[in-house]
Amino acid sequence: KPIMDEDKCAEVALEYMKTKYHEDFEVTYSQEKKRIIGRAGYAEVDVRVKGKEKEYRIMMCPDGYDDTDKDGYYDSYIVISDDYMCDIVNNKIKVELDSNVKNVIVNKFISDIYITERNISKIEGFWGFSSDFSFNEKNNTLDGLLKNENVYITYRIEVPENEFSMDYEKNITEILKPKISEDIISISIVSYPEETYLKREKIYKEKGYEEIGGLIGTDEIDFFIEEETNESK
């Protein structure tokens, strides 16, 4: 049985990313730069925009199962998914989601979001959004995304201790539930002492949420919002 050619996968992935996103990407040469799992039928290629540190992952599969030249490798490859699209969707939708939450948490909060397409077909190795997904005027709003796509949203909110309320779950659910179809929204609301919160807020505003670091809070609510037919009880 043929295996996957990691150099060819990297070549196809790089061309796909440059063509779709019009950025100058490079395949990364750090650890496990191209993780190939040929026996599982997929490969992972990591890339980054030249001059930037953040890496993105592309999931590859053989385009058919031929090995016509009998060199032990599949002849060709296709991209199944990538997670660069996650950043594009996250940045746009976060603004709207924060705006909705401001109707509940009227004072201070900071937040982080991660959105991925739901792997309805259970494709092994799927990560991020499918290669045929496009972010356009039909789905580039919160309402449009939840109406037209099957997505999984992970949303984390941090507040000072004196702002925390157990009513947040009920109130946020009431706002967001009417918008969803086959989507799932996972929400965590965490409180911190005022001094700790202000330190985290400062880093968030100056450098972004990724630079804050994990820290157990004083109180926490974790809940899912799903459509009525499969709602978590």
Give residue ranges: language-model regions:
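Exposed beta-strand-loop-beta-strand "reactive/processing" segments of non-cytosolic proteins
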Residues: 24-62
